[in-house]
Amino acid sequence: MSIELFHVISDAGSAEVRRFVVDHELESAVRFRNLHYPEVQADFARHQGSVPPAVWDGERLFQGAQACIARLSALSDVGRAS
């Protein structure tokens, strides 16, 4: 599964999600996509993105810091004992 995090460097919500990825050691599972770049903006628009940060999981776009963290939490819970 390829997870993409669309983010803005200067945005507080984006920083919160980037920190979550690092704190939960998800760097190998999440591709950071900086919305500063036109090609990243085009991909974001193709997924109907309008609010950073946003996580694309290959099927659905999750927008806003809390929605992103909720989606990424599912990745960090994989393999843990119940």
Q: What is the meaning of each model-derived region?
A:
Residues 1-31, 37:
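Local sequence-structure signature of Cys/Sec-based thiol-disulfide redox active-site neighborhoods
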Residues 1-2, 80-82:
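N-terminal leader/targeting and pre-domain segments
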Residues 15, 42, 70:
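Alpha-helical elements of the RecA-like P-loop NTPase motor core of helicases
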